[in-house]
Amino acid sequence: MKKIKSLTALLLALSICAVTACSSQPADSSSATESASATESSTDSTTASGASSETSSKESSDTSTKPEKPVTDFTTYVSNTVVSTGNNFYIEKAENITYRAYLPVEQYGELEYKFFFTNTVDSTYTKGKIAFVGKSGGSYTISNATVADGGTGVEDEITNRTPVTFGGKETKEVAADESYWSDPVTMNIPEGHYMVWEWTVSGEGIPCNKMSSLTSTASSADGETFKFCDEIPLPQIIGAKRDVKHTVAAIGDSITQGCQTEQMKYEFWASKISTQLGSDVAFFNCGLGWARASDAASNENWLSRVSQYDTVIVAFGTNDIVSGKYGGKKSSAEEIDEYLDAIVSYLTEKGCDVILFNAPPQDFKKTNEGVRTALNEKIPAIAEKYGAKFFDFSALLSTEDEPGKAVYGGHPNGEGGTVVADAFVKQFGSLFE
């Protein structure tokens, strides 16, 4: 497995933009778990996992030798929402469509914000027919963009609309594969209120976030009559200049993103970890539905964003087992092990503390469960190899008698989110004090 190329001027010169319009394409609400169940042989029964519960307590050999992270907009304007806003889908065409999203913030009050955009797809969606890792976006126009106080929910009046500008202008022409930041904007979000992001875009081939129903998202052709939209272009980072003592990022699939948990309740494990750590720890959720470890291992653009954070949670495996690398077939345990090795190697070289999760239970049948079991036996060794930390995600979401059974669902529900968050903070909470 070839290691990811070193990041050079990318972090200082990134200027990508992502915009996507809700198209008429039918929503694909099927989950990775459902697909897995449909594709495996029905003649084989689920086998016990026996995944290793050993944790790697090995620290980096000398933390003083870690490379110092350069000061960039990524480190100055850190994430201020637990909602994942990356690109895992692609809107074919939008004509003056206005998109609106309600975003919960981690720290309330008056803060200076900047927003980062990338006009490239981060990860593969299902088999990659429409969107795949590294797919280039087309050109599009931003007519206007604003942030506002959304009140305590969608029934409240939206107030304090504030323009977001780009190079001093309210409009912007975005080129294919461009990446960029907005200008700074100061915004006050009162305690318990949502930030509302809204913009109007036109163009073709706009990367977007799909499975965005964790929060209220909508589109409008006239800027007034909004309807639910599950394919929505958003900034990839809702960045705020915050005085935090630690930064944490999580990169993974729909389980990290929080899919199939109750809308606007933020009960998924990543959100609950963020809540328990408190607002003086910035949490950046980079989970994307259908993402694979092979996507992250081949996409420095996506991986480089999380590498700006002090600690990075890496949580992949399910979709590599179910669907495999884009353009390929289902991945073997050995192949997934190589992808994870490349990811952890890259992140440790960038000075990140890495917490590596194993693959969670999915009620797989025999073939896929065998791959998951073999993979989970390998993962602690990756953590040990790089001085990373290991978290037995799988054991928390199953039982000792039935290690392959997803007790809280293939996409863990709120109860499962609490179990994971409690165990995570108990094991690693002192690292963030």
PLM ranges: what are they?
Residues 245-250, 255-341, 363-365, 373, ...:
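Conserved SGNH/GDSL esterase-like catalytic core that processes O-acyl groups on lipids
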Residues 341-351, 380:
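Surface-exposed amphipathic alpha-helices with a cationic face
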Residues 117, 247-252, 256-257, 282-287, ...:
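Structural recognition of the beta-strand scaffold that forms the well-ordered cores
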